[in-house]
Swiss-Prot record:
This is Uncharacterized protein L682. It comes from the Viruses. Residues 73-114 are annotated as: Disordered. GO terms for cellular component: membrane. Residues 96-114 have a biased composition (Polar residues). Its main location: membrane.
């Protein structure tokens, strides 16, 4: 039964990903037409760059809003109202002391000669 639930969840994620991928191409075409209409190539790189940065900022803000709306917040968060984004750095740190894990490195690099 656990495999069925896992498969159902994985299949749902793949299906949602495919829908988002298809929708992204539709948005790409629309945004390219808007860009060509209001910022033709004759306007120069500066105005097209400003347009690209503006659209990127708007899309990032929408993504953060949707993340919070759907409750996709960190489960390990201490404060339930905390909406900050945290990244998993466990491959870099050992998780307990906040310092890099150097257990495989030699501690004494000096060479003794007799």
């Amino acid at each position: 039964m656990g495999n069925y639930i896992s498969f159902k969840k994985e299949f749902g994620l793949i299906l949602v990903g495919a829908i988002i991928f298809t929708a992204s191409y539709l948005w790409k075409d629309l945004l390219l037409e808007i860009e060509e209409k209001y910022f033709p190539k004759g306007y120069g790189l500066m105005w097209r760059s400003i347009y690209t940065i503006l659209v990127t900022v708007i899309l990032v803000l929408v993504a953060i809003h949707l993340k919070n709306q759907f409750g996709l917040v960190n489960k390990d968060s201490k404060d339930p109202k905390d909406k900050s984004i945290e990244f998993d750095d466990s491959p870099i740190r050992d998780g307990s002391s906040g310092t890099p894990d150097n257990s495989n490195e030699p501690t004494d690099l000096s060479v003794e000669t007799s």
